[in-house]
């Protein structure tokens, strides 16, 4: 267990039951250079390795619920072959090539498997705090739209569900989200949302902090940045457990998929991150539902030490509280 250096409280206030994952890949399109993900794909090809082509998605369907029509102006709904999904989850091929149906066309994508969980990864719950949860990790991938080196993709495959994000200048940020009604997948771009995802950050930044970070990134080339892997401890609240059908597996699947999206952004900046440990609240968690700052302080008190370099609390409880973090804290001790 390590001393607490930085605790970052995240309040994932998204329409979880309707629109799926947060659009966290939006930053990746702001570059004229190939992304690190694109360079990884290129290196894989240069080694004459083979992308396994799979036919996962079926043709588009006409189904779209009234609830969805109020949120999205246009989208694609398509079924997937669950046998193929299970095969990807079970076999975890090194590289995949598949097509995503979207608004009458097919987006051809290339994916490479990544390891987002630390070799010693374990998960625990409040129900049995000292007993590790039996968890089978998903198949986690990053990649690009074929021929588009500025695009970035993160897709996570599990036994009965996949989560995915595709980000590019041409399409915006596309989300692949399983519909609860019939199991088909809703595929839409954030450009076509009629409502914007709410999100508030309550972090108090020192004056000029953002500019200082930007200068640091600009002054240091991608190839010379530190290669140390940042280990991340993740804790989830009781409300998220309830939202995911009172299933620890569902919670960990969902949050590791979210982490894959976020870690892809960091990977494009040559920062490697992995999840070192996971903790699921399967009972009342005691964190504030009215103030993210209060919840952050409670989290610090409850977790004076943890297995990782950074700790995140991902919470659904509360009402659009947003997120909060301590800034400039990695070199300081807390607790």
List each model region and its residues.
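Intrinsically disordered, low-complexity segments enriched in Ser/Pro/Gly/Ala and basic residues
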Residues: 2, 16, 22, 39, ...
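Intrinsic disorder/low-complexity segments enriched in polar/small residues
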Residues: 3-7, 28, 98, 114, ...
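Fold-level signature of zinc-dependent metallopeptidase catalytic domains
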Residues: 29-32, 48, 52-63, 184-332
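N-terminal prosegments of processed precursors
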Residues: 26-180, 297
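Bacterial Sec-dependent N-terminal signal peptides
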Residues: 1-31
